[in-house]
């Protein structure tokens, strides 16, 4: 059983990285008609499209998006520090995405003045998006809280696999996920949505895929940490009501609504 659990832990990390790379050539296509046309051309297997159709940036197929690269930095920090060290994660993130990095281009300069010449898209190379730009500026200003307080995009969910894999089943898991998320996104809505996703991933890491994690009429017998043993980490936030249906999670009750 221990070997199976170890396989699921590794699988969560590798699976997230592979999925990110597989989707990268089709990243950020916001035009539904354009995306539908491309998918129709690709057939049933659009993964790892050889030619990028990304309208904002172009990277070689197999490379990560800005989200996958954040997950890599988080994984590296967790391994080197044998756990979450926010200060180390901040420094590694700054080095990976900051001055002199592959992400450091004139187009994605955090201090780039508005109203300049129109940028020709897509650019060659990775894209440094809003939360990372805000993070870099907060680091430059010497702030302790480095995350962007207005960004509520998908970063937290996309990069959570390493930290959930390390702390799955432990009382401090939610606390660690929140701390890692707030390094670049200091936004409550972003945090609570990420925590909900973390509970789903934790469930499957600990229990496998044989049992459904969705809404059920009977109590789940999965052995997950209950609320009395787990750090608060936004559990009672108003936005978490949609996550109450996760059996065995910190908010799970026998009627799928009872907060413990």
Predicted regions and their residues:
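Structured, active/binding-site neighborhoods that engage oxygen-rich ligands
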Residues: 1-260
């Amino acid at each position: 059983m221990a070997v199976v659990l170890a396989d699921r832990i590794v699988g969560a990390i590798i699976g997230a990285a592979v999925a990110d790379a597989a989707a990268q050539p089709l990243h950020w296509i916001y035009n539904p008609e354009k995306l539908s046309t491309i998918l129709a051309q690709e057939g049933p297997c659009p993964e790892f499209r050889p030619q990028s159709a990304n309208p904002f940036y172009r990277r070689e197929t197999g490379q990560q998006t800005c989200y996958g690269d954040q997950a890599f930095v988080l994984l590296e920090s967790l391994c080197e520090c044998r756990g979450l060290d926010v200060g180390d994660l901040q420094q590694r993130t700054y080095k990976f995405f900051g001055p002199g990095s592959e992400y450091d281009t004139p187009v994605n300069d955090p201090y780039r003045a508005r109203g300049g010449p129109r940028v020709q898209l897509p650019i060659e190379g990775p894209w440094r998006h809003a939360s990372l730009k805000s993070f870099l500026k907060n680091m430059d200003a010497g702030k302790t809280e480095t995350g962007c307080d207005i960004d509520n995009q998908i970063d937290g969910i996309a990069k959570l696999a390493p930290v959930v894999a390390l702390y799955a089943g432990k009382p401090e898991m939610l606390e660690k996920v929140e701390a890692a998320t707030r390094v670049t996104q200091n936004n409550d809505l972003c945090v609570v949505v990420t925590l909900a996703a973390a509970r789903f991933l934790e469930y499957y890491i600990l229990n496998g895929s044989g049992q459904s994690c969705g809404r059920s009429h009977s109590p789940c017998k999965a052995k997950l940490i209950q609320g009395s043993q787990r750090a608060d980490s936004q559990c009672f936030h108003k936005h978490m009501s949609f996550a109450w249906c996760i059996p065995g999670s910190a908010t799970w009750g026998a009627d799928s609504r009872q907060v413990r």
